[in-house]
């Protein structure tokens, strides 16, 4: 596959699609974090099943799988559920290492850029674009997002004021992205595309995910425009629609993978303990279960649900608060 001006070797798609069909992505169309994963699936040439979930609570067909976690997206492989794109993309890399999204020479810088993009860059973009596109948002979306952050639901005037406050914070950072590409490079960190390209792309994609109203904010940046075209060319792989009930059935009829061996830190609860985990920023719904893996990068809980039986839910270590039940 040719991406931009450099060749990136992708696997032979016709030989791999059938084998990858156990990947199930729970997502919705205008989720920017879901777009990050969809592009990762495309970059790696994978086939996957698409389960569309509501953008707001309740999510009755998702929470039996995750135990309460309701952020988007969630990757399901049999009876294993992977939460948070930081972990999802790494799990795709572990299962399908070629072509890599983590070139060793670029990995440390890529992680640093991804953290900036998905925190300091994305938050003001979200507030700016949401406040300026109020007429195009699903009913109840802003109230739902406020609940996820423990805030009272905002009225339209409050949202518009937030948009105006955050517009300068967005404009202050866009030149940084343009400058990363100003030397003519194709990708942000080095000669190869990597996870940093996905992490910076999806907040900028959010400008026009619903409407073209704010497309003018990106217009002054030709390097960004060309780079976004290269990332967009990854595509989304090949998806097949799946009913939510079928995804529940898959989990119910599949044994989860045995957890990888791990040695928890002394401060962690011991393996086998009943624990609680939740995100440390927003969407802090608690998931409870038995701790079966506590590694440097990943926390894994085993839990039982009357609808799906035994499932295993995976979280990244960073960004999550793990405690004894």
Name these PLM-found stretches.
Residues 8-10:
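Short linear/disordered segments characteristic of secreted peptide precursors
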Residues 12-147, 156, 160, 269, ...:
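GST-like domain detector, emphasizing the conserved glutathione-binding G-site
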Residues 117-233:
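GST-like fold's C-terminal all-alpha helical module
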Residues 237-271:
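Mixed-charge, Lys/Arg-rich low-complexity intrinsically disordered regions
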Residues 274-280:
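A short beta-strand micro-motif
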